[in-house]
Regions:
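Acidic, surface-exposed loops and disordered segments
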Residues: 1-119
């Protein structure tokens, strides 16, 4: 409730969403997600990676850990969504650069997993 269409990054330290764009570019998202059906999607959840941060903690394995963590988080989101009666599936293919541009990701942050949620 109270969430309007747009792009909302989550800031984990503040535990809040902040709207950074009020317009959702549906055609651009469809292209970036390589034809994934979005007609019934209410939410696209994009879990991003910060490999440099993970590598600072874990060395060369950090990049792999970042990918694994995104996958684990996506799995938990999928389980929770189904438990709430929502349709949920991971977008298996997408253009990294297109998704990053639509989200306005800074250099060094990359989309790892896109989860489509709806009814």
């Amino acid at each position: 409730e109270g969430v309007f269409p747009g792009v909302y990054p989550s800031f984990s330290r503040e535990h809040q969403l902040f709207q950074i764009a009020s317009k959702v570019e549906e055609a651009a998202w469809a292209e970036a997600l390589m034809g994934v059906a979005l007609d019934r999607a209410a939410v696209l959840l994009v879990l991003t990676l910060l490999p440099e941060r993970s590598e600072a903690l874990f060395g060369l394995r950090g990049y792999r850990y970042a990918l694994l963590e995104a996958g684990y988080a996506a799995g938990l989101v999928l389980l929770a969504a189904v438990g709430q009666g929502l349709a949920a599936y991971p977008a298996e293919t997408f253009h990294d650069e297109g998704v990053a541009r639509l989200l306005g990701l800074p250099e060094g942050e990359y989309p790892g997993v896109v989860v489509v949620l709806g009814r």
